[in-house]
Structures are given as structure tokens and as C-alpha cells.
Amino acid sequence: MLMPFRNEPFTNFETDAAREGMRLALEQVKQELGRTYPLVIGGKQIHTDDLSQSVNPARPDEIIGTFAKATTEHADQAVRAAHWVFDEWRHVPAAERANYLFRAAASMRRRKYEFAAWLVYEVSKSWVEADADVAEAIDFMEYYGREMLRLAAPQPVVLSLIHI
């Protein structure tokens, strides 16, 4: 049985354990900075010569990552790929779709410090702000998964008589 929705609690960085968890995540993420990321369309990686960089706003010389830029043709390919996948996805039951959201929320919850660390580097969030953004993302997945289940269930039909 699914528990009632409850907002993801914020991390209390006054505790040694929380500070250490965040410090370790920052070290881990720092080791991953500077990678190059291709486009991914229809599950296939596409490398382009036209690249752009994401930099740490607090340290503009620190490159977070380099990513392939898409063309109009790439956008068209992505729309076609999404349309093709939709033909299958639209038949996936709401409970299965909701389960994807719940599993993603659980994964993000387990890796909360890591996701927050990426926000610290990529957009110069403070630890508290980054933690709040990650908690909000978890809340969105939990809430909309529950809404999906609620809306997929039989709904009462309300008849009203309007007298003119």
C-alpha cells in the first residue's frame, strides 16, 4: 500500500553526518567534472563538432561539462523518436507509469547529496538551496505518481441539473 504523500524533509546541515555526506558527495562529483556529453536521440548517442560548455558561475574557469549542440535536424529526429515511442508508451498502464516515478524518487532520495552537489557546482547553489531543490524534485515525482493513480481510478460521475 502506498503511504500518503509527505514532503521530502530538508537535510539538517547542523549535524556532522549531514555535513560529511555532503562533503563526500562534493568530492565525488568534482571527480566527474569536465566530461563531454553527446546528444541522445532515440537511445542513440550523437556526437557533434558544435559544442558548448557549462561552467561554474562562482568559478568560470571550472568546466562542469561539455555538451553537443543540437541542430534543427536533431530536433526533428528527437520529435520523430518521441512520437514513435509514444505509440507504445500510451498503452502502458497508469500504475506502471507511476511506479517509474516512485522508483526515480527513491533513487534520487538515496543519492540526495550527489544531486545537491551537482547543483552546487553547476549553478552555485548553497548547500541548503541545493538540498531544497532536490527535495522539491522528489516531491514532484511522488505527488504526480500519486495523482496518476488517483486519476486512473474510477471517478464518480456528478450530475447536475441546470434550470434555465
Tell where the protein language model's regions lie, with residue ranges.
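Hydrophobic face of amphipathic alpha-helices that form TPR/SEL1-like repeat modules
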Residues: M1-I64
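C-terminal segments
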Residues: M1-L24, D133-A135, D139-R150, P154, ...
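Surface-exposed loop/turn and secondary-structure junction residues enriched for glycine/proline
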Residues: F13, G42-K44, D49, F67-A70, ...
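Glycine-rich loop-to-alpha-helix module at the N-terminal edge of alpha/beta enzyme cores
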Residues: P60-A152
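Conserved small/polar residues in nucleotide/adenosyl-binding loops
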Residues: I162-I164
